[in-house]
Structure formats: structure tokens, C-alpha cells
């Protein structure tokens, strides 16, 4: 039992660190780089920004890939922690988070395509510069749609994980309950937004996932520095042995 507790404690710290690391990475990549280079409604200016700061643009892509890798580590750590509570639900959450991670791979490929369109390669000379800029902007804009498709699955994954955290008592139940509510809110808002794009005029897009983001930051700090509630784990394991 001691070995099991030590293993869960280690994976909890991995999950906590990865929560915080992935959050910081995605903020740097998107708010610090991509949003800085992307000019809304202006394909020509966006193209000039990218080509003038190609290295920075590539760093943003690298950050996206690091974020994607972090998501894989996170889903594995959470699966190990939550599997003793309910293996099927833990697997479902891991699958949904994997789908979300794959959408980031698609977004990275779109960014590489945009960069290739602006590269000035010889085989692109048959196209007008404005057309290439518009196509590059189109591929970059597609990332917006891909993100919200992925966010639906991420919200579902977080909802399931939060429920299992609530059921397990690994973290304070009030925090886990907030996670369930904020994650379900994110998934619901995203689903409605996909069907009704004007929904963003009623609820700002930032409010879709901001509450869930707050939950993940707090949970990350809790798991990294506070760890799991080990007495509850020991009690559950003892009860399991008595039933056998």
C-alpha cells in the first residue's frame, strides 16, 4: 500500500506541474506571440508581421507543440491518479483530452501551411501576392474553429476529471465541485457557440474557458505543493482489502 501511495503522490505532482506548465506555455504562445503578429481583418499586415518576425512565429509554433506534449503527459498522470476511482470514466477523460491535444497538432500544421504560403518559393510565383496572403490568413483563421471544436472535448475531459476528483476526495470537494461546474459550463458554451456563432455576442468567448482555467491553476498548485489527501487513499485501500 505504501508503494501505491508513493506512486500516486508522484503522479499528482507531475499532474500539478503539468497543469501550470501547459497553462504558462499556451499563454506565451498565443497572447505573447500569435496574437501579437496576427492583425485582425488585415491579411497583408499579418503577412508582413510574420515574415519580418519569422523566428518568433516559429517559436510560437514550437510552444504550441510543447503545449501539446504537455497535454499528453497531463492526461497520463491524471489517468493513473483517477483510475482507482473509476477506470472507465478515467479512460473517457483521457480520450477526450487526447482529442483536444490532436486538434493542436492540426492547428500547428495550419500555421506551417500559412508560413509556406508566405515563403516566396518559386512554385508559388504563379499566384498573386494578395491571394497568397489571403490564403495564409485563411489557414491561420481556421485555427479559431479548430480550437473551439477541441475545447468542447477538453471541457468534457475536465468535467469528468473534476467529478472523479470530487468523488475521490483527493482535493477539497468545494474546489472539485467548482471544477465540475466550470468545466461543464465551458463544454456547454462551446457546443452552443458551434451551432449559434452569434452566441459570442451574448457570452464573451473569454468567459467560456476562463473559469475552468482558474480551476486548473488552483488545482495545479494544490497537486504540486499540497498533494493528494493520503489518509483518504489509505482508508479506501484498507476498505478494499477488508471486502476481499
Where are these regions (language model features)?
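Hydrophobic, aromatic-enriched alpha-helical segments typical of multi-pass transmembrane helices
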Residues: 1-244
Amino acid at each position: 500500500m505504501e508503494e501505491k501511495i508513493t506512486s500516486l503522490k508522484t503522479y499528482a505532482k507531475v499532474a500539478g506541474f503539468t497543469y501550470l506548465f501547459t497553462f504558462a506555455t499556451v499563454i506565451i504562445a498565443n497572447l505573447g506571440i500569435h496574437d501579437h503578429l496576427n492583425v485582425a481583418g488585415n491579411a497583408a499586415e499579418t503577412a508582413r508581421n510574420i515574415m519580418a518576425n519569422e523566428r518568433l512565429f516559429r517559436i510560437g509554433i514550437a510552444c504550441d507543440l510543447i503545449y501539446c506534449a504537455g497535454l499528453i503527459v497531463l492526461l497520463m498522470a491524471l489517468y493513473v491518479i483517477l483510475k482507482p476511482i473509476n477506470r472507465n470514466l478515467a479512460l473517457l477523460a483521457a480520450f477526450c483530452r487526447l482529442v483536444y491535444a490532436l486538434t493542436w497538432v492540426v492547428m500547428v500544421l495550419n500555421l506551417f501551411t500559412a508560413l509556406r504560403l508566405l515563403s516566396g518559393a518559386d512554385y508559388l510565383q504563379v499566384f498573386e501576392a494578395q491571394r497568397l496572403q489571403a490564403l495564409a490568413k485563411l489557414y491561420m483563421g481556421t485555427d479559431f474553429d479548430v480550437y473551439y471544436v477541441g475545447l468542447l472535448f477538453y471541457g468534457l475531459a475536465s468535467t469528468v476529471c473534476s467529478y472523479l476528483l470530487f468523488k475521490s476526495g483527493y482535493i477539497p470537494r468545494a474546489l472539485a465541485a467548482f471544477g465540475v461546474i466550470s468545466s461543464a459550463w465551458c463544454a456547454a458554451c462551446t457546443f452552443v457557440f458551434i451551432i449559434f456563432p452569434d452566441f459570442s455576442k451574448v457570452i464573451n468567448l473569454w468567459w467560456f474557458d476562463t473559469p475552468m482555467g482558474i480551476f486548473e491553476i488552483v488545482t495545479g498548485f494544490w497537486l504540486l505543493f499540497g498533494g493528494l489527501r493520503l489518509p483518504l487513499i489509505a482508508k479506501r485501500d484498507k476498505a478494499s482489502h477488508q471486502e476481499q
